[in-house]
């Protein structure tokens, strides 16, 4: 053999050909040779590369409407929604049972890092119950108050919910809010008491809380441990028994509700749809009721929990649909899709998300403007609750004014921009949307409305132009151990809150309801509440409209010039404390100049706070080694006159780093 290898490359090829032929005849490895005359010999060779077309497709016609259940899991933060979803996926065989099954449906990096659910996720589960095969469509929802819009969207595709409550912590503020979301949507509610394996768990106490607050009989509660898998199977049985099947008909024309969507840079928009009527399959031509554009369906399927293509989707089922939508504005959440030339009455959509917090967003480097614009457009498709307006700043350049549902929502959006699109941004101090009622017909004609909304403090109108200012208010719910009630009530009073209700939900826990001005809770209220209650209190709020308020626009001046980026709107009673704090932070952030810098907070022409950045000072007396004192005084006087002149002609340039530092400290306060 070695002589063949040494005779040149062609002899090596001859050897390879001989080995191949010998292997085929079974001379080298007889046990691997195919048996003659068998099916193995006549069968075409298998393809050894992957192909999307060869995916095994599920026949969804096997699941009639009567055997379909659509449900969500709702709960307060960290009460075990995602863990329960993991166990349900394991029980139904959607995923293998391994120790690594943690937050399977939480696919975003930010969700895994923070241990929270941000995006509602769907999974279709196939479950055999009493000899029948059922299709259970599960939607895992977020628990934080900032993402309640995600919850309400998810509930529109469901007929029932699992209301998960921690057996140790009991009912919390977001539990109450989520219950009423499901109750108002007239969904079947199955209470599930989780974490019964904990040492301090008291499921009987929680059962009584559920009975008292929600008026649900205690015997309807299911006690489980999602972590250990204890009694989880009874949850699936209850879903089938207690949640009704969707009222849908395959014979009717197609009506599909788009309740969520994601963007894939290769396949375009992937729309999550709930079919209320009809059937949709690959090749169908569909029309968007919102844009009236026509598309051809490229792929339909279910999430199990990963994408699983199917031949068709039928009425009552929940799945995904890809139809060549390349523009991020084409997939509107709440839109109705129907078959071409078969128009239908559009389904009622969703209330548009109402931004509670606005902040300016600018690229760190203006050369990255177009990349950041593209990233924001794609991310707002996945998160349609973000409102975007173009904005510009003298110091920070071109950017946007973005509206968010809360501070956590803003932080998560910023983190997703960095992680998913590698975009670095500057975020300004968050503000809330105020309103002003204009005083004259001339102004009403100019603005085209009597009541204007102000999302940028720099555009806050002067008092002479308005009859009254309005600020947004929210109805807040606080649930706390009774030992912290006094401290929390004092905190609420300091935030200008008005008490509306107070009730004991059991012997040791109190539920307080307050009407808060939104700007008093938007930055640091939650942190203060947790600090005062040693982490035990929970907080949730809902929009309660607007109320009249004494608001003032506070300008920040550097040597008499207004810095627009630091203009803020505050309540008259808090103007001094807020102004002084901003001046102090700016003093620590600004670099010293050759002249003195006066940092002032002003309400109109009235200065209410001031800090001074001292000038660099040259020692002009260094060359004087004694002599007459008048010589020294003359030099010092000349230096002072020069500094005064320099201050008049010198413009204070605020470095971008100083802006970032001041704005970040203000929002982290």
Swiss-Prot record:
Binding-site positions, GTP: 75-82, 140-144, 194-197
Domain tr-type G: 66-247
Transit peptide: 1-49
Subcellular location: Mitochondrion inner membrane
Keywords: GTP-binding, Hydrolase, Membrane, Mitochondrion, Mitochondrion inner membrane, Nucleotide-binding, Protein biosynthesis, Transit peptide
Keyword Membrane in record: yes
Gene Ontology BP terms: positive regulation of translation; translation
PANTHER family to which the protein is assigned, alphabetical: TRANSLATION FACTOR GUF1, MITOCHONDRIAL, TRANSLATION FACTOR GUF1-RELATED
Family: Belongs to the TRAFAC class translation factor GTPase superfamily. Classic translation factor GTPase family. LepA subfamily.
The protein's name: Translation factor GUF1, mitochondrial
Encoding gene (name): GUF1
């Amino acid at each position: 053999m070695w002589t063949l290898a040494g005779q040149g490359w062609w002899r090596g090829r001859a050897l390879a050909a001989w080995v191949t032929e010998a292997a085929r005849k079974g001379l080298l490895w007889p046990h691997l040779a195919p048996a003659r005359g068998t099916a193995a010999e006549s069968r075409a060779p298998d393809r050894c590369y992957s192909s999307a077309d060869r995916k095994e497709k599920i026949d969804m016609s096997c699941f009639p409407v009567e055997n379909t259940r659509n449900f969500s899991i709702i709960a307060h933060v960290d009460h075990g929604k995602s863990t329960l979803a993991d166990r349900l996926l394991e029980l139904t065989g959607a995923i293998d049972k391994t120790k690594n099954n943690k937050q399977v449906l939480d696919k975003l990096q930010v969700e895994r890092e923070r241990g929270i659910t941000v995006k509602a996720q769907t999974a279709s589960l196939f479950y055999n119950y009493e000899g029948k095969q059922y299709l259970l469509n599960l939607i895992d929802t977020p628990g934080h108050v900032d993402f309640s819009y995600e919850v309400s969207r998810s509930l529109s595709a469901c007929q029932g919910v699992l209301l998960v409550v921690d057996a140790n912590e009991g009912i919390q503020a977001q539990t109450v809010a989520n219950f009423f979301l499901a109750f108002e949507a007239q969904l079947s509610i199955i209470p599930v008491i989780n974490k019964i394996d904990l040492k301090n768990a008291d499921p009987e106490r929680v059962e009584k809380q559920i009975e008292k607050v929600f008026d649900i009989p205690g015997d309807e509660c299911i006690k489980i441990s999602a972590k250990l898998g204890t009694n989880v199977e009874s949850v699936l049985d209850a879903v089938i028994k207690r949640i009704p099947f969707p009222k849908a008909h395959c014979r009717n024309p197609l009506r599909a509700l788009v309740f969520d969507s994601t963007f894939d840079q290769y396949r375009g928009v992937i729309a999550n749809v709930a079919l209320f009527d009809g059937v949709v399959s690959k090749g169908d031509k569909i029309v968007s009721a919102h844009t009236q554009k026509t598309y051809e369906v490229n792929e339909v399927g279910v999430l199990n929990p990963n994408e699983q293509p199917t031949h068709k989707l039928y009425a009552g089922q929940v799945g995904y649909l890809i139809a060549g939508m390349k523009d991020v504005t084409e997939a509107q959440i709440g839109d109705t899709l129907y078959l071409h030339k078969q128009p239908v009455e559009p389904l009622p959509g969703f209330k548009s998300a109402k931004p509670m917090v606005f902040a300016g967003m600018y690229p760190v480097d203006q050369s990255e403007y177009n990349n950041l614009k593209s990233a924001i457009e794609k991310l707002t498709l996945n998160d349609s609750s973000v409102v975007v307006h173009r904005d510009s700043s003298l110091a920070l350049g071109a950017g946007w004014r973005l509206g968010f549902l809360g501070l956590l929502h803003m932080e998560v959006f910023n983190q997703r921009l960095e992680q998913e699109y590698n975009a670095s941004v500057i975020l300004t101090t968050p503000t809330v949307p105020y309103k002003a009622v204009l005083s004259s017909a001339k102004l009403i004609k100019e603005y085209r409305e009597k009541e204007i909304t102000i999302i940028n403090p720099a555009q806050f109108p002067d008092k002479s132009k308005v009859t009254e200012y309005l600020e947004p208010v929210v109805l807040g719910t606080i649930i706390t151990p009774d030992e912290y009630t006094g401290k929390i009530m004092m905190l609420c009073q300091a935030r200008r809150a008005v008490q509306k209700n107070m009730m004991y939900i059991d012997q040791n826990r109190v539920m307080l309801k307050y009407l808060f001005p939104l700007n008093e809770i938007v930055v640091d209220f939650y942190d203060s509440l947790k600090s005062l209650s040693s982490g035990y209190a929970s907080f949730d709020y809902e929009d309660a409209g607007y109320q009249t308020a004494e608001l003032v626009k506070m300008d920040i001046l550097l040597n008499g010039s207004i810095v627009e980026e630091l203009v803020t709107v505050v309540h008259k009673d808090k103007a001094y404390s807020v102004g002084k704090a901003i001046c102090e932070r700016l003093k620590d952030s600004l670099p010293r100049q050759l002249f003195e810098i006066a940092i002032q907070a002003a309400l109109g022409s009235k200065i209410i706070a001031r800090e001074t950045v001292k000038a660099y000072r040259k020692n002009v007396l260094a060359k004087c080694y004694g002599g007459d004192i008048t010589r020294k005084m003359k030099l010092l006087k000349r230096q002072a006159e020069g500094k005064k002149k320099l201050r008049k002609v010198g413009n204070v340039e605020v470095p971008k780093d100083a802006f970032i530092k001041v704005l970040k400290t203000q929002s982290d306060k």
